Swiss-Prot record:
Region listing for RNA-binding, in residue ranges: 75-114
Outcome after substituting H80N: Does not affect viral infectivity
Organism of origin: Human immunodeficiency virus type 1 group M subtype B (isolate HXB2) (HIV-1)
Main location: host cell
Triggers of expression: Expressed late during infection in a Rev-dependent manner.
Chain span(s) of sequence motif HCCH motif: 108-139
Renumbered residue ranges of the record's region Interaction with host APOBEC3F: 14-17, 74-79
Segments of this protein annotated with the region Disordered: 164-192
Gene name as annotated: vif
Lineage of source species: Viruses, Riboviria, Pararnavirae, Artverviricota, Revtraviricetes
Entry protein name: Virion infectivity factor
Impact upon substituting H139N: Abolished zinc-binding and viral infectivity
Stretches for region SOCS box-like: 151-180
Reported impact of E76N: Does not affect viral infectivity
Amino acid sequence: MENRWQVMIVWQVDRMRIRTWKSLVKHHMYVSGKARGWFYRHHYESPHPRISSEVHIPLGDARLVITTYWGLHTGERDWHLGQGVSIEWRKKRYSTQVDPELADQLIHLYYFDCFSDSAIRKALLGHIVSPRCEYQAGHNKVGSLQYLALAALITPKKIKPPLPSVTKLTEDRWNKPQKTKGHRGSHTMNGH
């Protein structure tokens, strides 16, 4: 029988970022209770030797599975050190990989309070609304002018510790373009 290869997208992440993310997930599962229904699988519960952990996040009748890996081939930089993360959306027998931004949006659909567009309508009708969004990572678009105006009136409350963002977990903090000052010293430009 010949070898069968399965190719997966694995985001290279440094070890400390993975540790921080796991810690945030466990805190919100066991202490704050904001991640009710999430399931954390340790490395010793997995039959695969390269899997460091898995977090299963129920999304209705589907689920999001964030798997962290160790012992992979090192990346192009010394600090990659063979650590990585894959993000998978599963429903029954179907599964597909998703990017970190979409994962954060899916999580936000089901978890964490949000001051959303519906809050504007509720406020006009005199109903009590949640005055802030607890999970800013789930928003990657600019809101309506009404939403921005109402959101500007209410200062967001800082949540300690922050909620676990998949985008934050997979972002490349070393290869971001360096910001330099413009001609007058006040404007910023991205590497130009």
